[in-house]
């Protein structure tokens, strides 16, 4: 059931996935559903809704990623990082979260589904100091763009991109972008079977 739904959603989004990738995406939903009963990783309870609200919602960003190395901050159970890693095996994803149970889940997913391009780090974002800066910083969890840029400013290299996944756009929030950063693009995202607003904001440090 999940497999056929996933195939239909991917086709609707013009995303192509191998049989292995589709199996990994379905496996991720099944593991999330199983672990959620004991560890309360998400408020979404049904696998069908997890597929739409978590996996497909995450994958809407996939066509807009540029670069090789990404960090997903406040990733929770691995969103959007794990679905994006499955669909982009040529890219590397660091999944950052401060809660141990979420990191344990991610590591189990990595082991069971054999996802080789993710690494999980248990840390608060402001305390994490990467040896090599990232091409992109991803977030779908931060309360505001301002918080994301303030707490994550040290993570990308000078030309790296901040990818903020948002629901409805808040004009006040957009006007409060901190000094030294610029909004490059606002992209309207369409998630299959989800009648809610979704946007991707691409930002970076001002150059020069």
Swiss-Prot record:
| EC class name | transferase
Q: Which GO terms describe its molecular function?
A: rRNA (guanine-N7-)-methyltransferase activity
Q: Which residues hold S-adenosyl-L-methionine? A: 74, 79, 125-126, 140
Domain of life per record: Bacteria
According to the UniProt record, one GO cellular component term is: cytosol
EC numbers listed for it are 2.1.1.170
Name of the molecule in the record: Ribosomal RNA small subunit methyltransferase G
| Organism, as annotated | Shewanella denitrificans (strain OS217 / ATCC BAA-1090 / DSM 15013)
The gene it comes from is rsmG
